[in-house]
Amino acid sequence: MNILAARKYQTPRNGPLTLEQTETRRLAYSIKSTASPSIDFDTAAREMAALITGPCWLVPIPDSNGNTDANTRLAHHIARHVNANAAGIGAQVVKAIYRTQPVQSQCARHKLALGPIAPEQHHLARNRKVLTLRQTYFVDNVTTSGHTLEAARLALGFGAGLVFADAATRRTQMQVTLF
């Protein structure tokens, strides 16, 4: 699974955080809620948009309860900053996946010292929206194990992850070309 991340998500367990690392954590939590200031969404979106080019699809990842509001808002902010191609097509937001039943949030699981949820236990499914052939990115605030993004890819059949922060201890960051 290819995952693009604007920032690395550091944990205080590895020592004191710098001001930049603290701000990354604050922004990552902030963009989980639509009630957060637009400037937080825009800050994250600018950095995420710099990792991709249009034309592309931005598919919001449903949260643990199936709500896509926060990630849809983030995706719309990203779309505003993605450069369009010669035909004027940039990034377009499409709700192409949904959660068939709630799952325990990764944040809650982490607090209980539980491991990640396996991709097949995320209960993500593709809806009937037709996507034309172009780069497709699953939009989320943070990735830990990558299993949610992998579940989205399995549900849709293709796509790469686009996150604000990557909390994995080891993962290669790269620009993705799917076609």
Model segments located where?
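PRPP-dependent phosphoribosyltransferase catalytic core
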Residues: 4, 12-17, 150-179
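Hydrophobic Val/Ile/Leu positions in short beta-strands of Rossmann-like dinucleotide-binding domains
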Residues: 60, 138-139
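Substrate-recognition/cap helix-loop segment adjacent to the acidic, metal-dependent catalytic center
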Residues: 70-85, 89
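Short beta-strand-loop/turn "lid" adjacent to the catalytic site in phosphate-handling enzymes
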Residues: 57-73
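Hydrophobic anchor at the start of a short beta-strand
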Residues: 56, 91, 136, 158-161
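Active-site-facing substrate-recognition patch
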Residues: 1-57, 67, 97-133, 167
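A phosphate-binding catalytic loop at a beta-strand-loop-alpha-helix junction
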Residues: 139-152
